[in-house]
């Protein structure tokens, strides 16, 4: 399974831009209005806090906020920070592109050239499909299985992954070793179920997708009848792939998705595919140690390699390249607009394309994120915030230590192992100690298409080069400006990039109640991931190992079944319910995160005065809830219900708090209130 990245960031939490570019230097909070940790003006006093706390804390904002037309969702905290960061990063990239290079920055010339290539819409229009046709010509060399292997390797090398994915990963049984991973993939729709379900909504999306595919092929130069014929062949191939893939819930099982094999085993599983040719053309002929996430998918690949004619493979490879480059907005506007219309209507609900400059900030950050991130961190990240965050982390780890020492349902052997794991957790805050080397990344200022392929190729090669080499424990999986955080179970580490360590999550000089309610819960959330239904399966060294005695493991499962049942009962959108099994890990982390942060706050604080008219205890919970105020279009809610391991924001607030006696006490909520679950139904894991 690819290295687990358990994230807080909403997949589409984007927002309207602020006009004007900020000056370089200073605090990002000085560049744009910041969102306060607690804002009474956005609350709805007509709602009782004990009935629906999310509506109480966010209701005024939800009633008045208008989603910008280019946004599928807007989160009051994540999106507000993201928007400020986009402005700051834009200013850095523009200055580099203009040739005003700061010698203290890393690779400003490459940052500037990549940004300029992305922003050159006239140049992209003028080049037309020239680069695409050159890549298609290489795909047209696919005439048999050896040439198909070369064609797949060429595309995989360029970060386009038809048929399957290949990556590096830590060996789940020996986390010190880096091996290769062959994983299910190759689909164009967001999830396998979009191909397999036969309800009216799914059939509508399937029909719309085939029409979209045909229109894209026509834009790429095919006659309409030939485009329609290729569409049906491509769709049939993708649907066959989808039918052998595991669901997102099945893919959450680290035991099931760990299947170690060597090159001979890979060749035995898929004998028709010339793996030696593929690996040689990939540039990694020496790879010999692998895991695969989905053995049945390898069986399906074997069938497809044996039975699918070369002309279908050529059509499919061309489509996957075309779709990838259109998603990067590296093709003329007609491709971008066609793709937007399909995805917005069926999956996001956005009414307009995101402004080009915002896309280019994200693309530049994706290609050269640690170069841009070094400049960002040097100018805008305050070290005092880093030290305060470390203190909060320490306090929350102490709360977890106390919890593990006292929890009644855990026996001593399991408790010792849990405490040992907690003591070995590594915390990374702000930015890495060593910055990524981009010497080998090739950027072509005159061609955004080639720059995207160059950046993709650099990253694929960097990733695969790790196989067989010593584990780099200093590597970060997120760039510093990212408004996010994660726990990695195989490295047993928590990472808090600089991007999230600003208002409203962390506010210098704010009362502890506010900071613990916001960034403190983020910390508690990530810490709990180390002991959720997935994280608990890894030991202190990051190895997949059952260190729980059977009776304690059974009790853990009983407690998590309560969480599944609770969230299964929540409405997501229309007639769709939250998937309690898909969201289980995040729901456990939400439950544990708020409880641990509240315990740490109570242990750390001296007497605090009321905050914005609330007691300190109440202020903690208001800050927590207001961090999740989110407006989301129904199209995106439907997509998230099918694919996102996070619950909708309302339930990320009301779900945990309705299980928490400390919340009920803070607001004097009586038994029977909407925010007080019956004692027999109350869920508690950590």
Feature locations, PLM:
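Active-site-surrounding "flap" and adjacent substrate/cofactor-binding loops of secreted or lumenal enzymes
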Residues: 31-34, 48-52, 56-124
